[in-house]
């Protein structure tokens, strides 16, 4: 095993980048960077039937968007390649042959139907399903007979009996498995493709991976991988298994869970900021010292401590994600937020598909109005409904405000002044409201609340003069005149 910290994120291109996988990649990245080590991306693409055409590209694209820059992968060979499992058969085959020659593995000719019948019988007896070793000691004659029948063999690893496999997990502490509870398992499928637990151990060894950090759904894979290391006399890496991510019902995050968006692509499409998503994911199952929760990537690298990875499940808190992204939104320059929001405004037909300079200028003012409230760029559409829809029916509280005794006088003065106002801009509108205050003697809530309700139909909202400017003179005058 390498003295240098070398970790890997090894996705299958069978789907897009999931929040859970993004977290695995992120913690591996932080661990490597904290110790000035290497972050390696290896593509486990042996499941040809399930691989998506753009699955690999999507993984890389979204990792890059999140800010997870890798040191080695298919595009950066550092002498440990190939970095796609499908291109490593020449590495696996001599090792498979060695295990067969040393009788540490054997060919199994049982059919899927026979294996399923065995499994069902074991379950019916209340036993844990496991392979019973029927083909563990075939004679050469028996093997030839099965091959004459056209049976294709898988290759099984011969599990040593009465042995304990232990490892000191960096998150969970000491974990042990009794080998007698593990049946002889398949290392090469009937189609000649190595299985996950075999290939991953070989790859980790030859790529000199020092630490394997992954979700705790992989704990049961670990003894099988340790068996492979021991069979070849290799030193296993250190293992760390992160707690699951759970939803509001404290159930494991499932890809079928419609309450939570689960793919990085979806957050990109909605206009979340990559540095905000990085920050939020980094706090899913890990916590810094102190109360602060907003950190830059560089700060996370500096303070990351694997000892602070949590044993307890990590709660995916949608409200917290909204809060974190809002913190970053507030700090961003308006132009960046506007460019993120523009596709959403166009999609909602609020800005033309080919916008004029006037449209773009108006859009920038709209964003400036709501930027401090936005949880994500796409939220500009529901937030700014009052600019595009008819005035909503007033609620009871709004009715009380607009029916105030001084409202007709207030609206009459304001209407006449705004009608004559040029340019119709926030600074001038603010002066105009002050003039109305002096002329009428109406001030404070009695001044501002009726104006806001009259032009927006709402009791609260962003800066009133800016809101009036963005609404535009025609719309504002139409709304004011009904209350004169």
UniProtKB/Swiss-Prot annotation:
Enzyme class, UniProt record, top EC level: ligase
Pfam families: Anticodon_2, tRNA-synt_1c
One annotated GO biological process: glutamyl-tRNA aminoacylation
GO MF term set: ATP binding; glutamate-tRNA ligase activity; tRNA binding; zinc ion binding
Record keywords, A-Z: Aminoacyl-tRNA synthetase, ATP-binding, Cytoplasm, Ligase, Nucleotide-binding, Protein biosynthesis
PROSITE patterns registered for this protein in UniProt: AA_TRNA_LIGASE_I (PS00178)
Protein biosynthesis found in the keyword field: yes
Family designation: Belongs to the class-I aminoacyl-tRNA synthetase family. Glutamate--tRNA ligase type 1 subfamily.
Cited PANTHER family: GLUTAMATE--TRNA LIGASE, GLUTAMATE--TRNA LIGASE, MITOCHONDRIAL-RELATED
Quaternary assembly: Monomer.
Protein name per UniProt: Glutamate--tRNA ligase
Protein's organism: Staphylococcus aureus (strain NCTC 8325 / PS 47)
